[in-house]
């Protein structure tokens, strides 16, 4: 199959469907329901999500990160504050997330404002990370240019020696971010691109605080 043919391939969507009556009026509860489905289906890294950010120059940047918590307050991930995404979020604290669970032909897209979580929350999460990952958070000046791999290995050795067998504190340049959603879109794949799409939009006038609308595929 040529590259263009592959791009035009329809895919094999099972005959799942998504009805308005089946949706939870709260998008976070609905997301968590779908997340549980993805875990039950054996999706590898169901918490992997594409995170799109833009800085003051308007140039977009996207990468995959891991969701660490989701509740009524929003979606939490952790990173280096001095990384490209950290700098962009400092300049423009809005972002978009996309989860793709291909085994279920499902996608969830989220947009909203992003704020850092408090230090206590970041400290608590950092303490649960493997020691090697804690060392890496100190050793890696994320997104900065390296002379070669040896330079990074040297930094790891230096950090390891610095803390020896002592507990490793959270670096001041590393911590969590919480995206508070103002829109959540659910996408359920259907045959012939006649997919089911529903958009939750935050709306104070609605009894649930959210307006739900079906979108054209």
Give residue spans per PLM region.
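Binding-site signature for planar aromatic cofactors or substrates
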Residues: 1-217
